[in-house]
Regions:
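Terminal substrate-recognition subdomain of acyl/acetyltransferases
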Residues: 2-30, 66-76, 80-118
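Residue-level recognition of conserved beta-strand positions in structured domain cores
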Residues: 23, 35, 44-45, 77
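Conserved donor-binding loop and adjoining core beta-sheet/short helix segment
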Residues: 31-40
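Generic alpha-helix structural propensity
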Residues: 42, 56-59, 77
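A short, internal acetyl-CoA/4′-phosphopantetheine-binding micro-motif in the GNAT/acyltransferase core
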Residues: 45-52
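Conserved acetyl-CoA-binding loop-helix of GNAT-fold acetyltransferases
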Residues: 53-66
Length: 118
């Protein structure tokens, strides 16, 4: 039997400078960022432990990157989870700011789950 994943809503909480993933009214994940002109700077992604391994991080990153593209903005990335996502989905690589890319993709140590947990 396959468990259904509840519908995930992603919103940009501009005042708090986070993209939030919600199931109903509950925030289950976030991408923390700062805005610098027409560029967002991602610092880290968090998914609450009890909601990990359900694809929430993937939905959150996808919708946040789609929003950046729709706004005509660029991204400086310091989050390894987002770096791994972009490496696996190179169609988003053009969003990385050429002058301020952040850090290059780094692999996590084998067997070590990052704090992000997707």
């Amino acid at each position: 039997m396959v468990a259904e994943t509840p519908e995930i809503t992603v919103r940009d909480n501009v005042e708090a400078q986070v993209y939030d993933a919600l199931i109903g009214d509950q925030v289950v994940g976030s991408i923390v960022y700062e805005r610098s002109g027409q560029r967002l700077v991602f610092s880290h992604t968090i998914v609450e432990p009890e909601f990990r391994s359900r694809g929430i991080g993937t939905v959150l990153v996808t919708k946040a990157l789609d929003d950046i593209r729709a706004r005509g903005m660029t991204l400086t990335n310091y989050c390894e989870f987002v770096a791994d996502f972009i490496a696996a989905h190179p169609g988003y690589a053009d969003l990385i700011d050429a002058e301020h890319p952040g850090h290059p993709r780094r692999r996590r140590a084998k067997g070590v789950e990052g704090a992000e947990g997707a």
